[in-house]
Amino acid sequence: MDADLNKLWEKTLNIVKSEMSEVSFNTWIKSCEPISISDTSIKISVPNSFTKDILDKRYKSLVANSIEAVCSKLYDIKFIIESDLNNEDELNSSDNSIKNRNKNSTKNIVVNDEMSSTLNPKYTFNSFVIGNSNRFAHAASLAVAEAPAKAYNPLFIYGGVGLGKTHLMHAIGHYILQNNTKAKVVYVSSEKFTNELINAIKDDKNEEFRKKYRNVDVLLIDDIQFIAGKERTQEEFFHTFNELHDANKQIILSSDRPPKEIPTLEDRLRSRFEWGLIADIQVPDFETRMAILKKKADVENLKVANEVMGYIATKIKSNIRELEGALIRIIAYSSLTNREVTVDLASEALKDIISKKQGKHVTIPSIQEIVANYFNLKIDDLKSQRRTRNVAYPRQIAMYLSRKLTDMSLPKIGEEFGGRDHTTVIHAYEKISENLKSDENLQHTVSDITKKVSQN
C-alpha cells in the first residue's frame, strides 16, 4: 500500500468508525485493506466471501461516502477476496485478530419488558471471544442482529456443549434491543417451549400460548433438537415457524448438531431449518482458549500469569465452561491456601479434574448410553432383537465404536448387545467401516459421537 493510499484509508476509517458500532466495525471493516487506487476506483482486500457479501450489501456506500468526505472525490469501491488476489485457497484469518474488547465499551443493555428479561446481561457480542473455531458463527450472528429477517432466516447455530451457542443467541437479542427498544424479542429453551405448550393444552390456553410466540419480532429457541420425537410440539412449532417466517420475523435456533443429523425430526421442519444459514462452532484451539482465559481474567479483575493460563489451556480442551471453571477453581484454591498462583499450584488445584480426563477408560455401557441418547432411543433398544433401521443402524454404530474404542473381545461386545454372536459384531464393524468411506453424514455422526464419548 503506498503512503498516500495509506493516509487516505486511515482518515476514512476514522469516519467509518464514527458511523458504526464498535462490534460491527471490528467484524466487517477492521480486517479490510486497500490494495490499489485508479482514477475511478479503489480496490479493497477482504478476508472471505462472507465478509465481501456483507460489505457489498450494507457498507459499500458508507465506505465510498467516507472516502469522498476525505478527498472530495467519489470512487467506485471494489471489494476483492484475498484468495482471488493471491490465486490460492481462501486464506484463514489468524487468531491474532482475536479482539479482547474493553469491557467498558459495552453499551448499556436496554431491558424491553418481560420479553427480554430472560436474556443474560453478560452474554453480549463485546464479551464474546472470537477465534477460528467460532469466527463464522459470530459473523453470521452479528449479520442477523444488524438486519433481522433480512440477512439469514432462520439462522441455525450448532455445536457441542459449552462452546458459545447460547452466548451468541443472547448477544443477538441484546444487540437488536439496543438498536430497537420496541422490538419484541423472545428467548426460550425448547424444553420450556414444550412445557408451556403442555400447560396451555391442559389449561385450555392455546391461544395465549400462540399469541406469546407468534406475536414477536425475533424468536430465539435454544437446543431445538429436543423437540424431535415430540409430535404435538413439532406440530405447534411448525405453524409458529411458518407464521413468523411469512410475517418476515427473525428466527434463530441452536442445536448440538445440524438439522440433517437430528433423528426423529419431521422432514418438514428439517427442510425449514435449512432455509437460511447454518453455522457451526467447533472446539476452541489453543490460541482461542488462551484468549478466553485472558478475557475471563480481565472481566473478573484477576491477575494470572501467562504460563498459568497456558497450563490451563493445555490441560482443558473440551469446552469454554470447563476452561473458565478451571481458572476460577485455581483462584479459589490460591485464596484458601494463601499461596501465589503458579503452575505448581494450578496443577494441585486441577489434579482431580486432570486425572479424571487422563485416566478415563471408555466402556461399552458408556458408548451405548451416548449412542442411544444421540438417536433418541433407549439402551434397551440397542440390546433388543428389533431390526428396524431406526434401531439396527444405531446398534451397528455402537458396535463399531465398541470395537474401535475399547479393548473388549468380539464375543464380549456381542454379549453386551443382547447376547449377540461375535459374527454379528464383525458384520456391523465391517459395514460401518465400509460406509464411512463414502457417507459424509455417517462420518459426521461417528465423529460427533466419538467426541461425546471422549468428553463423557
Swiss-Prot record:
Stretch list, region Domain IV, binds dsDNA: 335-456
Coiled-coil region(s): none
GO molecular function, one term: lipid binding
GO cellular component: cytoplasm; plasma membrane
Compartments reported by the entry: Cytoplasm
Cross-referenced SUPFAM superfamilies: P-loop containing nucleoside triphosphate hydrolases, TrpR-like
Pfam families linked to this entry: Bac_DnaA, Bac_DnaA_C, DnaA_N
Region (Domain I, interacts with DnaA modulators): 1-73
Transmembrane helix among keywords: no
PROSITE patterns linked: DNAA
GO biological process: DNA replication initiation; regulation of DNA replication
Stored CDD domains: AAA, Bac_DnaA_C
Region (Domain III, AAA+ region), start-end ranges: 118-334
Highest taxon, organism lineage: Bacteria
Database matches in InterPro entries: AAA+_ATPase (IPR003593), Chromosome_initiator_DnaA (IPR001957), Chromosome_initiator_DnaA-like (IPR020591), Chromosome_initiator_DnaA_CS (IPR018312), DnaA_C (IPR013159), DnaA_dom (IPR013317), DnaA_N_dom (IPR024633), DnaA_N_sf (IPR038454)
Binding residue positions for ATP: 162, 164-166
Keyword terms: ATP-binding, Cytoplasm, DNA replication, DNA-binding, Lipid-binding, Nucleotide-binding
Annotated segments matching region Domain II: 73-117
NCBIfam families tied to this protein: DnaA, PRK14086.1
Similarity section: Belongs to the DnaA family.
UniProt xrefs under PANTHER family: CHROMOSOMAL REPLICATION INITIATOR PROTEIN DNAA
Record's comment describing the protein's domains: Domain I is involved in oligomerization and binding regulators, domain II is flexibile and of varying length in different bacteria, domain III forms the AAA+ region, while domain IV binds dsDNA.
Complexes and interactors: Oligomerizes as a right-handed, spiral filament on DNA at oriC.
UniProt function note: Plays an essential role in the initiation and regulation of chromosomal replication. ATP-DnaA binds to the origin of replication (oriC) to initiate formation of the DNA replication initiation complex once per cell cycle. Binds the DnaA box (a 9 base pair repeat at the origin) and separates the double-stranded (ds)DNA. Forms a right-handed helical filament on oriC DNA; dsDNA binds to the exterior of the filament while single-stranded (ss)DNA is stabiized in the filament's interior.
Official protein name in the record: Chromosomal replication initiator protein DnaA
UniProt lineage: Bacteria, Bacillati, Bacillota, Clostridia, Eubacteriales
